[in-house]
């Protein structure tokens, strides 16, 4: 297990020197954030970022994310240009020592929540997805903006994108994903870079847009499109676990035993009666997922990929990027570390 931590670059209130102080953190998960989606990342910019990360004694080997341009997801004639740029990004990142690239194939929006500052009983604030709030949301007119969303779109551009997706159902999106994978995975193989798709969050259609990386059946279908270890998963326990139809422990066991999980996002969620959910502390009793069992199957299957604590609450008066404060994610990192250390020692005692 290689424990890592997400960092949003120079503008992140969470500084590298703070992350360095979390015991057992080895790698930084980051990206180039000032280049428009679909354009090339220069080797100079990549090496500058690498040098900054490594100056704090941390590794630069996981990128999250290299975003996929909407023209690729839509299957437009212009997609080949953006796919060629994507290939070049894989090549340049490999030259800098990157081993895993996380990405997603969600139309227009990344992860979606209906509120980013829900106050919990203990006074902390968290991200929530309430279905009654979603009914009142209009992404074309509302003001909600989330860290995963591309904020560069104007309202007119968003409206135009929604119109283009009118003719894209799940099967069309599958076809466009297949086209993309068959282009980029051979490059990833040549460069020894493992591609790791992130599940859709939440794992069902939203705002009338199709979503396909959502459940075990669809993950099986995805992995068979290009049956290569370089075509793998970012397994996000919260993204898949926020839907009751997903057996997260079973799925982690299955895909880690196949060697197809390259990156784990570990967080907990509390499922509500109507299918809504709240993000919780990582500690298993705080939510609906059994983090200990998840870590046990990873350990059993000798998982040696990357793992990071995912979204955290805002605690101890911290403010900043929703879900990405320092304190609660640091607690999550140490919870994960403690479980893993215990499993390691028990395993050695049993031999």
From Swiss-Prot:
GO terms for molecular function: ferrous iron binding; manganese ion binding; mannonate dehydratase activity. Its EC number is 4.2.1.8. It catalyses: D-mannonate = 2-dehydro-3-deoxy-D-gluconate + H2O. It is an enzyme of class 4 (lyase). It comes from the Bacteria. Belongs to the mannonate dehydratase family. This is Mannonate dehydratase. It comes from Clostridium acetobutylicum (strain ATCC 824 / DSM 792 / JCM 1419 / IAM 19013 / LMG 5710 / NBRC 13948 / NRRL B-527 / VKM B-1787 / 2291 / W).
